[in-house]
């Protein structure tokens, strides 16, 4: 199916290297806007003369908005030009953040955070652009670069947000993010491709088609299942880690716990490398290697917590393995319909995000109920199931990289 559709995809000018790196930068900024208020939650509560619990509920509108954006906004890049869709999204994101910095009503804060969360899906939109406009033989490489940008955003959002909030106050910190988004909005209009998507399906028809894609397409269904499993594991480990390290015998401060996120730097490097390897050896091999590394690291985390160095090493390998698997897995989704990949990517990311949300809830509660070791064993089991799905499906989970690898082998290359 994917081969036939790929053959019908219209020829477009390849993405220039400078544009790809701008896409990575834009993905980093857009993704980072979900996180900067989290380390400043106490300051926000004091500013609003409210409780941390109430502010936490307002911040919860961000993930809700993000899930809405995955379904409502990401498919737009199949129909309209990336510079138009993403330029507008960054503009609205900038406006929502600017208003967040000046309002004094907690309900309005929640609504604005929801709008910002919806527009912060620009990373998923840019991934879809990579799938549509990158040459087939470089799709994994380009996707790896964009995903590395998303990884930077996940890591930098909390760190930069917390630092700026401490230095200039949380309102000025949000204004800095708003100004950056305004600049990127203008640059998006100037730098991103102007080519319109070839999809003739109406917007409402596209939205109605999303649930059915999972039922009809085996590749999407398998990719979604294993992606949700390992994102469940990823979020459970990091959510559980914060709880475990905050309690005796560790009793680390929030700042000390936050420094463990630096282990996520490995994910940035792994994402970029995994893209190139996916183009060379195929998605399935990269997924299996990534899951093997992540599963072994999760198992080691059951007894590594007493050593900071061992914990950081395990977390670095854990993140690297899962980010590598994510790049390869997403490349199989984008290869299903290269002419209009956004609705497949939107559906995949929705399933993926649901897995992560369940993992966050599980990780925090499980450490309290059954302890750190039992929690991590469950995450390792989830990764093992994802690996078994990949092993058992064979060609059904193959993406464009796997097809190219097979063609090279048949040609004796």
Regions from the language model: what does each represent?
Residues 85-98, 178, 285-299, 380:
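Structural signature of the two symmetry-related core transmembrane helices
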Residues 145-192:
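Helix-loop-helix hairpin linking two adjacent transmembrane segments in secondary transporters
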Residues 69-81, 270-283, 367:
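Helix-to-loop junctions at the C-terminal end of transmembrane segments
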Residues 113-150:
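Cytoplasmic helix-loop-helix junction between adjacent transmembrane helices
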Residues 122-134, 324-337:
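Intracellular juxtamembrane helix-capping segments at the cytosolic ends
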Residues 6-14, 193-225:
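Juxtamembrane intracellular "pre-TM" segments in multi-pass secondary transporters
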Residues 68-106:
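Conserved MFS/SLC helix-loop-helix module at the cytosolic interface between two early adjacent transmembrane helices
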Residues 285-329:
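C-terminal transmembrane helical hairpin of 12-TM major facilitator-type secondary transporters
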